[in-house]
Amino acid sequence: MSNNANQEEITKNAPPAPLSPVDEEILAQVRFAAACAEEKKAENILILRLSAITEFSDYFVICSGNSTRQTQAIADEITEQLKPYKLRPLHTEGYATGDWILIDYGAFIVHIFTQSARQFYDLERLWRDAERVV
């Protein structure tokens, strides 16, 4: 095995680096957003840590609702509950249709899908190299 391949294998199997205080704060915000989604009965909530594989965002929160009305309610809950913490979305997409609502907070992005849209876009497969946060 070449040195590069050997280094890749070591890096791939290494435990994640400890989080800085700023990263801990971001993760707390991400977990709070996931808890807000859970309050509105979101299903299959998943947090992915992307910081090791991309630079555009540190985390994804991915969840599902059973209808477009529910996905919109989940989005509303998250945005309203994060406001007191001075967290406002940089951008929101898909709210009107509700099949896939994307709420971009910069350091993390919330994806709220209907069941069928989640299966179709399959972000879990697309970002399968990301660390799953418990």
Spans of model-derived segments:
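Active-site cofactor/substrate anionic-group-binding motifs, chiefly glycine-
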Residues: 78-89
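Glycine/charge-rich, flexible interdomain linkers and switch-proximal surface loops
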Residues: 44-56, 90-107
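Short hydrophobic/aromatic beta-strand micro-patches
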Residues: 62-64
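Long, contiguous binding/interaction regions
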Residues: 1-47, 52, 69, 73, ...
